[in-house]
Amino acid sequence: MGACPPKAKGPWAQLQKLLISWPVGEQDWEQYRDRVNMLQQERIRDSPLLQAAKENDLRLLKILLLNQSCDFQQRGAVGETALHVAALYDNLEAATLLMEAAPELAKEPALCEPFVGQTALHIAVMNQNLNLVRALLARGASVSARATGAAFRRSPHNLIYYGEHPLSFAACVGSEEIVRLLIEHGADIRAQDSLGNTVLHILILQPNKTFACQMYNLLLSYDEHSDHLQSLELVPNHQGLTPFKLAGVEGNTVMFQHLMQKRKHVQWTCGPLTSTLYDLTEIDSWGEELSFLELVVSSKKREARQILEQTPVKELVSFKWKKYGRPYFCVLASLYILYMICFTTCCIYRPLKLRDDNRTDPRDITILQQKLLQEAYVTHQDNIRLVGELVTVTGAVIILLLEIPDIFRVGASRYFGQTILGGPFHVIIITYASLVLLTMVMRLTNMNGEVVPLSFALVLGWCSVMYFARGFQMLGPFTIMIQKMIFGDLMRFCWLMAVVILGFASAFHITFQTEDPNNLGEFSDYPTALFSTFELFLTIIDGPANYSVDLPFMYCITYAAFAIIATLLMLNLFIAMMGDTHWRVAQERDELWRAQVVATTVMLERKMPRFLWPRSGICGYEYGLGDRWFLRVENHHDQNPLRVLRYVEAFKCSDKEDGQEQLSEKRPSTVESGMLSRASVAFQTPSLSRTTSQSSNSHRGWEILRRNTLGHLNLGLDLGEGDGEEVYHF
């Protein structure tokens, strides 16, 4: 009674799944959830057992339990038992009574979506009901039960993601006592959910960073006493991400800094100077198949790019870029420009000869044609051109050999879709290389029309030069602006432009369909009308007019409407759209530049031979830290905030003494013998006793100075961590 309907088998199972999942779309998820909740409440009201469990009605529960016809296994609308209902409403007494009568209820999960697999222990943990958790564990509740329903999956529909196990639920709600209790009863801290996420992965995804950091430390303290060879922090999920890498992908700077604090080793401190060794495990992209830096720059979340400003990532990237990345990138840019000059020269001096056949069409102006293969390489000039063509073809092959493996490694959608990684430029360069090889095939087979692939290849090849603008801080963000304008503003504008051109070109053609084309031939046929309207739209040409003849009246009306809509409205709209895109990208200028540098550095590091790009950092053996690699960073901390803090403490003390000074002014005998305050010692000021005539003005001045100092202190403390000058060594 109240249980879920039996599941269909075979093709009917897929159909049933489709019909069930149909209403659970992004737009209907809230309605679906509300409908489930309504059915659940109706079912609870219809069942005396469930209603008694909800209202903690112990008298009614005892009567029902004594009734042998009462089914303790009856379930609600989502497959929940009476124990689920009692746990949901924090009714400890009702839950205890139910477990005494039917202990097996402690292990029973919910059977229907969206709460499949949820046990009463999951609910008690989420409610942080410690006593109920103890009671459930005492009666054999499973600490390894998994809640796999749609309500517990990581999805935009759900507001929370706590994993599937009770331990991850307890860690996410921040209950240290329940976490310890579950581990004492055998909960596996290395358990993974259907996504492969451990409890550490799930903590990374929580919005409450404070609880997450505390629970992270607690769980690691238990893992340190385990017998596993691999640390829990190094266990990857199904995407190959460890908790540390997941923090980078999600842009969780708080957790990233917390983990880095656990990994750093302070060498020495001397006044404002501090030398620190930072563990580069999982950070350095050298030899990493799934690079942390590449994951950060390719993340869809803007917060991830803030990781690039954190120590030691900022110092590591800066060192690699200045020492290896920038020199190699400039060399690569120079080689590519020379290569394109060679290709362009070969195209300009391609083998041509006079046309053999006679021209029969008066509109045909062709006088030259391409030579056959046997005639193309005869003279000394042809041999020189052959060398350039071989260089061009070899370069195209090298480009494909470098690009194609990365497509399979990263995936086509991510490789071509990430702007920071240079996605559109990868499409351009691969297309260019393919066109060069196509031209070679056409040349070898004596096929006519090689001018078509050559023309496109020249345009695409020279457009690829813009990729190397990312090596310069002034030009790098502009390439991203161009990409966003082309694939964002321009694409939307082209749809509107196509509609307007089709409409007005048809109107112009119909208007001049009955007129003599010799007098005004811009709209004589439909293709010509389309092209002329396109030129008019972009104001390339002026409106066609012939004042020696009478033009159709409808032409004037149509052209006036076209001029207002196209020129005044749509072109200015397009300019405004591009201006908005420029403003938005300009706000992220520094972030985008840093991300471009990181992506370029990782790309070069992956492509270059190891002897040209040695590993960065210091081996831990030199400091007795094992085989891990470290980056040494020297920080110079500004002590001004500390000095201002002492000033503020002095001012606070002076406030307390103001009242005493007022009393001392009434007693002249004690004016000279008062104790010096901390402020007088700190500032070496005159005696704090002041005459009555000077008291008000002096007190006002001290108050202004004190407030300004407090404001300066708050600003200094907010920015104090970033004021230090950092120097990094290897």
UniProtKB/Swiss-Prot annotation:
Chain positions of ANK repeats: 44-74, 78-107, 116-145, 162-191, 195-228, 239-268
Region (Interaction with S100A10): 598-602
GO biological process, one term: protein homotetramerization
Tissues where the protein occurs: Detected in kidney cortex, in distal convoluted tubules and cortical collecting ducts (at protein level). Detected in duodenum, jejunum, ileum, kidney and placenta.
Residue ranges annotated as intramembrane: 524-544
Reactions accelerated catalytically: Ca(2+)(in) = Ca(2+)(out)
Quaternary state and interactors: Homotetramer. Probably forms heterotetramers with TRPV6. Interacts with TRPV6. Interacts with S100A10 and probably with the ANAX2-S100A10 heterotetramer. The interaction with S100A10 is required for the trafficking to the plasma membrane. Interacts with calmodulin. Interacts with BSPRY, which results in its inactivation.
NCBIfam families associated with the record: trp
Function: Constitutively active calcium selective cation channel thought to be involved in Ca(2+) reabsorption in kidney and intestine. Required for normal Ca(2+) reabsorption in the kidney distal convoluted tubules. The channel is activated by low internal calcium level and the current exhibits an inward rectification. A Ca(2+)-dependent feedback regulation includes fast channel inactivation and slow current decay. Heteromeric assembly with TRPV6 seems to modify channel properties. TRPV5-TRPV6 heteromultimeric concatemers exhibit voltage-dependent gating.
Entry protein name: Transient receptor potential cation channel subfamily V member 5
Species whose genome carries this gene: Oryctolagus cuniculus
Gene: Trpv5
